[in-house]
Amino acid sequence: MPLNKDIKKVLVIGSGPIVIGQAAEFDYSGTQACEGVKEEGVEVVLINSNPATIMTDKEVADKVYLEPLTVEFVEKVIAKERPDSLLAGMGGQTGLNLAVELYDKGILKKCGVNVIGTSIESIKEGEDRELFRNVMSRINEPVIQSEIVTDIENGKAFANKIGYPVIVRPAYTLGGTGGGIAESEEELDEILALGLQVSSIGQVLLEKSVKGWKEIEYEVMRDSRGNCVTVCNMENIDPVGIHTGDSIVVAPSQTLSDKEYQMLRSASINIINSIGIKGGCNVQFALNPNSFEYAVIEINPRVSRSSALASKATGYPIAKVAAKIALGYTLDEIKNAVTQKTYACFEPSLDYVVVKIPKWPFDKFQGADRVLGTKMMATGEIMAIGSNFEAAFLKGIRSLEIGKYSLEHKKFREFSMEELKTRVISPDDERIFALAEMLRRDYRMDKVAEITGIDKFFIKKFRWIVEEEQRLILSKIDDLDKEWLYKLKKKGFSDKGIADMLNISPEDIYKLRNIWGINPVYKMVDTCGGEFEALSPYYYSTYDVYDEVEVSKNKKVIVIGSGPIRIGQGIEFDYASVHCVKALKKLGIETIIVNNNPETVSTDFDVSDKLYFEPLTEEDVLNIVEKEKPNGIILQFGGQTAIKLAKFLKEKNIPILGTTAGQIDMAEDREKFDELLEKLQISRPKGKGIWSVEDGLEETKKLGFPVLVRPSYVLGGQGMEITHDEKELVYYLSNAFQKNKKNPILIDKYLMGREIEVDAISDGEDVLIPGIMEHLERAGVHSGDSITMYPTQNVSKDIKEKILEYTKKLALGIGIKGMINIQFIEFEGNLYVIEVNPRASRTVPYISKVSKVPIVDIATRVMLGEKLNDLGYRVGVYKEPELISVKVPVFSTQKLPRVEVCLGPEMKSTGEVLGVGKTLEEALYKGFIGANMSIKKEKGTILATINDHDKEEFLPIAKKLHSIGYKFIATSKTAELLKEEGIEVKQVRKLKEESPNIIDTIKNDEVDLVINTPTKGNDSKRDGFHIRRAAIERNLGVITSLDTLKAIVNIKSKEIKDETLHIFDLSN
């Protein structure tokens, strides 16, 4: 069936901000889908609130609306654009839920919009737990014994009937939000209350636990004629009980017999035929390891995290094919873009092994509960490809950037066998290293398999790796012969991993490899196991005989990607990498990307001329450089991951385009940077590195409180704190020195001023600032967690001129060629520099979109020697637009048990949304709604607990809230303060006092919003921490910054209404 000619204009709903459970994979699938629809001559209208995406670029869709993803705003877009069709399955759970809501409210029918692809009825059968169970029962597909409940009493009754443990799965939620495994009635009470609250339809599935069964996934495509193909089957190494997003996954499955494989494949096809899927669908099974018994866990009737992985693992562009199916094509009419010979009805075959390992944020959150369960906690993932499981797995380990190049983790040497058992029975992010230590101590393999639920096949593979590691530890370099080294390299061991165990340098192994001619070759991912010639140059390394890479003599540049999504280094850097590649291609330069993230646009097969899916380590990057011999390598767009390679590449005499390793060091080394500032006569807050608590107290006497204290050599504000008095300072310093005595602690005078930020481009002579950004929260809140406003609202002309002057001095002083990011503080009329990053920053996509300056394109051309004055955007500060745009951070702290919520110098947000308006209030209103902050709630009850430093500032805000009609609940001191000002307040007992106390008011739903300004940010033993956590876990708004609160109150008093707001197409 060819293209449906009735489809002229399609609305695509994006997935919104990056949160745990919904990350960059939807930028990748959304971009692919939009391009797939556009190339058929159909107009694409996009709504998505996330400015950090390629998907929201004006080249991807015909009309781009960066607006909140709510029914009200989508309806506005529909009314303005009049699309005839809606493509619902490309925006993750957010897009799906919105499509169902638009349908149920009759908006689609009223506006004459047809849902193309999978129908709303089919989506409901896949998403609504009860409807899904009914379909499974009708087609005789087994499901786990379960009950749908809408209240706690019925839930408890069912659990008592089937026995504990039980699994709680809320309907229409993301990444297992609100779910969990309840081992007792007390745990069930808590999980069920939350699950019912977060489910958009107040419905939860309770099911008997099959914890320990194998978890198997099938990625299936189906067209409107009922043709089906299974694109990929994947096996979770971790058993059922750990969310698939937190599991290590291998493709194709390694331990299924042919009978099991065919049985589950037939079941997958049976299920998607019965539900009537048109497009892609992910089916998850639980398989009893001791029999042929299986049960269907759930399906995702849309593209998903797993479909992004399946796409990258096979080279089959699932999202693009799904979009074509939605337009009316059948699988036998859609050409395979990789081979250009076969069609989408050919099932991919793999002659290699793919491993996905999640990337968790626990380096940022030391106090977090790391135990993995049914609720996803990973922020991102890496993918590795090898010719055998061991090679793919070890590549995966070193891709995680956790400093591990083998399965040895020194801290587990100190653990007793009982402690190790605990770490694998209640598995956390480090369970593989604990398991390896057990095998190192000769713990029986069958016992390890029994207590972990991991198949003996994988345990054997881990055992082989551990045995080789032990042999290396007991050997010297002279024992390493050519055959042994070749065998180790073939199985994925890195030079550094081998060298560490032999106690020599990686350079020694590198030299030996070169003497013996042991170098990697590169194989192609071609979707067809080499059966047809592939046109997509998409490669992985292996130690083999035949090399499939054709090296050209063209002018070429390698772009280093940014690796897995994590807090502090998100999708913004992938955006920058992709735009760099596009700029190079326009200039006729061959582009090569090296990256290892399966979720991103940069690793799509047709973005660059060549893609190497490899770890971003020194050895793996050097192998590619030696193979390709590029004219240069670009590190500026890959975040800290890429920048870290600068020194090594310089030592190897590899030409780095743009800013050099020495210049990077000048910006990042505190002493060199201070010398430069002194020479340029630029101020920074006074400060010093100290080595003891006594030194710290002495230094603070000179500086005066408050001071900002932080460890040296950290990223993303890790471990920073603002202290206001001696007691707080002593507490922080003694803890910090206990953790690390090797490096100094930096103490700076904390200036409570206005924070201002610029991304600038320098060509070595001139500087262009596309836009000066102002932070809403005063300095002290990490720039990634601040609300950012552009154009600035409170910055004088004089200060702007000084910003340009300082930016030019710094860029030329360091010698920047390309991008530079500078953060300033304006305090009492003076301007201070607080940080300089000699690379692209996380604000690049935001400022590119709202200033309309193609920053990455210009920076790339400047790196290649062009001059700013010749590129048409002039120099200096670019002209400001009329519209105001705010970037509002989005947090995933609800997903991470025992993690601090309050804003501070350490970054915690996972994503961002954009709010665009004619006034600041309009822009902020949209930003808050897009970030799901409770801005719309009409009058309610506020629980206020205010730190002594903030009480004076809080009073006028409280009066305003009171005058709007809010009621207050507070503990004794805050309550007294409010009463003195004539504000009615209900006093509650403190946490340590008897019930009913402050936590009970939160648990009993007596509160709508919590305002809590913290005392000691990082101390999880304090009341404030428990208050904030209790509120977040109940889906309540928590505000810890008075600046944010002021902005909200200001908007509330203006009484902005959705219906009066304009929407803006940013593609013009």
Curated annotation (Swiss-Prot):
Mg(2+) 1 binds at residues 284, 298. ATP 1 binds at residues 129, 169, 175-176, 208, 210, 215, 241-243, 284, 298. Gene3D superfamilies: 3.40.50.20, ATP-grasp fold, A domain, ATP-grasp fold, B domain, Carbamoyl-phosphate synthetase, large subunit oligomerisation domain, Methylglyoxal synthase-like domain. SUPFAM superfamilies: Carbamoyl phosphate synthetase, large subunit connection domain, Glutathione synthetase ATP-binding domain-like, Methylglyoxal synthase-like, PreATP-grasp domain. Residues 1-401 are annotated as: Carboxyphosphate synthetic domain. Mg(2+) 4 binds at residues 835, 837. Residues 933-1068 form the MGS-like domain. Residues 550-932 are annotated as: Carbamoyl phosphate synthetic domain. This is Carbamoyl phosphate synthase large chain. It comes from Clostridium botulinum (strain Loch Maree / Type A3). The gene is carB.
